[in-house]
Amino acid sequence: MDMSIRQALLKNFMGNSPDWYKLAIITFLIINPLIFFFVDPFIAGWLLVVEFIFTLAMALKCYPLQPGGLLAIEAVIIGMTTPKQIGHEIANNLEVILLLVFMVAGIYFMKQLLLFAFTKLLLSIRSKRLLSLAFCFASAFLSAFLDALTVIAVVISVSLGFYSIYHNFASNQADAELSNDGFIDSTEKKQTLEQFRAFLRSLMMHAGVGTALGGVMTMVGEPQNLIIAKHLEWDFVTFFIRMSPVTIPVFFAGLAVCYLVERFKLFGYGAELPELVRKVLTDYDKKNSEKRTQQEKAQLLIQALIGIWLIVALALHLAEVGIIGLSVIILATTFCGITEEHALGKAFEEALPFTALLTVFFSVVAVIIDQQLFGPIIQFVLQASESSQLSLFYLFNGLLSAISDNVFVGTVYISEALSALQEGLISQSQYEHIGVAINTGTNLPSVATPNGQAAFLFLLTSALSPLIRLSYGRMVMMALPYTIVMTLLGLLAVEFWLVPMTHWLYEIGLIAIP
């Protein structure tokens, strides 16, 4: 039956999103101006923030750029903020945009090396506990220097490749549909596949948490870290040292959790790699290694050298992060022979949707600033004692980051803390301590749900998740031991260790007195 133009417009609006979600967004767009003009701009502003967080929580139904962008456009039209204020926020955070555009694209051209490393890791370590620790540690180390999304994308590629190799073997089909187990006729092969799925689920979760453990440590580990570092005027090394009283204990606690859940087979962990699967994968890798050409070996060597350049350039702060990322693109493409525009364009596909979404974040931050929405919360926090302020900032950030995007939350709170400093409500020293509390608060508790960590959301929405039966609920359950330990230890560190350890770092001359 032919549909009318009205029906076609409604069908096209937000694509395949559920009808109730489309209706909710339309309702928001209708009531926001009414409340802004006829009730109270402050209430309307808070309603917009809640609605925006709701769109982030519904990321699996519809990417937040569309519904969040509509809300942001309307906010400008009705006068909640101005294009000038949004432009000011974007200009202040240009480094973050350059990080997402150039660094993520740069690492894309090093995927070949990362795939090689993770493949060798998986096949060379037979102990599941050691392998889990290795994946968690490797993901943490890489995420401290690279983008967490890229790291998890590489681990997904490795796992998806291995899954397809065994699935094709088990189904006796060279190009079998990966989601179809109907061709697997043997009960033993089906049981082996289920065990392999459980094995891959646990590895993916360890790697995902590893990106959070490493990502919190450095200014390039997560996008919000760079925003916080810019507000605090810290370079790469200073940021790492200032965060260390909280991040180092939490890192080792995270590794301990990784070992314990595997040792005692808790929360869905503990599945071993079946011997049959190991043999199939090892044979496949051996054939691939024998077929590797001298040209491909040279590409791996070049990528390893570029990796060393990346770490040195970041550690010595030789240029802005985005510029270093651009240098990686130029070096990797030049010496690996990638010169076609089409091939270059693929590298930017991963980051640009999130870059656009980040710009919408800045629009909502502009509304928060213009309408002074966080004034009462900040006043409440600043009325507490200095030590309690740190815990409150950590907890408020952690709570919001678990249900919303941590880039958005971190940006809002560090902006408010800077305003408090400029108004003379807090000292420079306290402002820096609050910066640590905000950074750790946005990064550590956010592993609780896929909404908080972009890497987790990327994993959940990947082609791998349905194949290994990794649902939203299962991710939350498997992340639970990490969430509890990392959140509580982070809170203890902020409350009891941060200030005395920072003073000790002053005394031994590792950081300068503000």
Swiss-Prot record:
It is a multi-pass membrane protein. The chain crosses the membrane at residues 13-33, 34-54, 96-116, 136-156, 203-223, 236-256, 304-324, 349-369, 392-412, 448-468, 479-499. PANTHER family: NA(+)_H(+) ANTIPORTER NHAB, TRANSPORTER ARSB-RELATED. Na(+)/H(+) antiporter that extrudes sodium in exchange for external protons. Pfam families: NhaB. It catalyses: 2 Na(+)(in) + 3 H(+)(out) = 2 Na(+)(out) + 3 H(+)(in). One of its GO terms (cellular component) is plasma membrane. It comes from Proteus mirabilis (strain HI4320). Coiled coil: none annotated. It is found in: Cell inner membrane. Belongs to the NhaB Na(+)/H(+) (TC 2.A.34) antiporter family. Keywords: Antiport, Cell inner membrane, Cell membrane, Ion transport, Membrane, Sodium, Sodium transport, Transmembrane, Transmembrane helix, Transport. It comes from the Bacteria. This is Na(+)/H(+) antiporter NhaB. One of its GO terms (molecular function) is sodium:proton antiporter activity.
